[in-house]
């Protein structure tokens, strides 16, 4: 673990990696990877640099947010290269305060989460807020073929923290009376659903 302290690679917040020039050929680094594309890319790049540039043995474990973050906090995983802080604010703040993890930087500062509607539809129907989505005639525009009488809001994948956040928001905003919180099942299916909305 001395190597990890030298590199200061305990926790990479939202992706940016920061390394010193220290190297150790007898090191092992355990990376945590997630089940979405940008995290996979960042983890692969970090693994390549650590292995080829520093001569370390690299192990990578892939999973959903909850188990990977738990393993990071328990120090079973050394590095993650991306995390959505808004989804885990208290856990991250607590572990930063305890010194369990170290924040090194940000690589995607403009990343945001929320409910989105394509601009042509929003402009045509005057959609400006969540309240507008609760009109029955608007919900019909997004009909869920598996839930007659309700619209479909394509959510995050079950296992991602944002899925639970969206589920709570549906109930708090009263959207659950009009829409399903649809789990697309995979990152690829989520991408396809978003792209399909513009056809």
Regions found by a protein language model. Name each.
Residues 7-18:
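Bacterial N-terminal signal peptides
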Residues 46-54, 132, 140-180:
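Ligand-binding cleft/hinge of the Venus flytrap
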Residues 100-155:
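A conserved helix-loop-strand patch within extracytoplasmic ligand-binding domains
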Residues 1-6:
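Positively charged n-region of N-terminal signal peptides that target proteins for export
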Residues 25-38, 56-61, 149-154:
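Short, well-ordered beta-strand elements
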Residues 43, 63-99, 189, 193-197:
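Pocket-flanking alpha-helical
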Residues 71, 78-81, 154-199:
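Ligand-binding pocket segment of bilobal, Venus flytrap-like solute-binding proteins
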Residues 20-22:
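N-terminal signal peptide c-region/cleavage motif recognized by signal peptidases
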